[in-house]
C-alpha cells in the first residue's frame, strides 16, 4: 500500500508527518506519474478554490476523479471534503470531483477568527479536533454513513464506500485515529 497526499496546496505536510509516524509508505502527489504510483489518496485541507484551480492546471483533476470512481480509497479533510462533494450550496457553480453524495456550505462555522476545537466521537472513541473555516455538511445522500457529529447534531465526518471526508483537521492534532481508519478503508 502506498498512500499519496495531494501536495499542491494546504496542510499536506501534516498528513505526510502522520503517515510517517504510522510507518506507512507514502508520497507527495504533484503529477500524474505520482498519482499512478499510489493505492490511496488524501486530499488535504486548504483553500478549495485554489486547490481546484491547481488540480485543473496540473491535469490531475480528471485523473483523480477517475481513480476514485474506479475504487481507489480517498480521504478529504475540510477543503478536501468540499472537493469530493457533489454540491456546494453557497457556490453552486463550483466544480467538484462529485465522488461523495453530500452537499456542503463553505466556511459554515465562521471565518478564521471563529476557528475552534471540539471533542467529537469517532468510532466509539473521543478525539479533540480543530475546525478551521470548516465546511458544514448540509445534506447526505443514500449510502452515506455518518462517522461523527458535533454535540449540536452537525455531521462532521462521513463515508460512502471508498470515499471518506471530515470537516475537521485531524492532521493538526498529532492523533492518528482517523488516519488509521482510512488506512483500513476497503480492507474490512
UniProtKB/Swiss-Prot annotation:
- Domain of life of the native organism: Bacteria
An example GO CC term for this entry is: cytosol
Known EC number(s)?
4.3.3.6, 3.5.1.2
Q: Which reaction does it catalyse?
A: aldehydo-D-ribose 5-phosphate + D-glyceraldehyde 3-phosphate + L-glutamine = pyridoxal 5'-phosphate + L-glutamate + phosphate + 3 H2O + H(+); L-glutamine + H2O = L-glutamate + NH4(+)
User: A single Gene Ontology molecular function, please?
Assistant: glutaminase activity
Per the Swiss-Prot or TrEMBL record, the active site comprises: 78, 169, 171
BP-aspect Gene Ontology terms: glutamine catabolic process; pyridoxal phosphate biosynthetic process; pyridoxine metabolic process
The entry assigns this protein to a family as follows: Belongs to the glutaminase PdxT/SNO family.
**Record protein name field:** Pyridoxal 5'-phosphate synthase subunit PdxT
Q: What organism is recorded for this protein?
A: Tropheryma whipplei (strain TW08/27) (Whipple's bacillus)
Lineage, top ranks: Bacteria, Bacillati, Actinomycetota, Actinomycetes, Micrococcales
Amino acid at each position: 500500500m502506498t498512500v499519496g497526499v495531494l501536495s499542491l496546496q494546504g496542510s499536506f505536510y501534516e498528513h505526510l508527518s502522520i503517515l510517517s509516524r504510522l510507518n506507512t509508505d507514502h508520497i507527495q502527489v504533484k503529477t500524474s506519474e505520482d498519482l499512478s504510483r499510489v493505492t490511496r489518496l488524501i486530499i488535504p485541507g486548504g483553500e478549495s478554490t485554489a486547490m481546484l484551480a491547481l488540480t485543473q492546471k496540473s491535469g490531475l483533476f480528471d485523473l483523480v476523479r477517475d481513480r476514485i470512481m474506479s475504487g481507489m480509497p480517498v480521504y478529504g479533510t475540510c477543503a478536501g471534503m468540499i472537493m469530493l462533494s457533489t454540491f456546494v450550496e453557497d457556490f453552486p457553480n463550483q466544480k467538484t470531483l462529485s465522488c461523495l453524495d453530500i452537499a456542503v456550505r463553505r466556511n459554515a462555522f465562521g471565518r478564521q477568527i471563529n476557528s475552534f476545537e471540539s471533542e467529537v466521537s469517532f468510532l466509539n472513541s473521543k478525539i479533540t479536533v480543530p475546525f478551521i473555516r470548516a465546511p458544514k455538511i448540509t445534506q447526505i445522500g443514500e449510502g452515506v454513513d455518518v462517522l461523527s457529529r458535533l454535540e449540536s447534531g452537525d455531521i462532521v465526518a462521513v463515508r460512502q464506500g471508498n470515499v471518506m471526508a471530515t470537516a475537521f483537521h485531524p492532521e493538526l492534532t498529532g492523533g492518528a485515529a482517523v488516519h488509521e481508519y482510512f488506512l483500513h478503508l476497503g480492507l474490512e
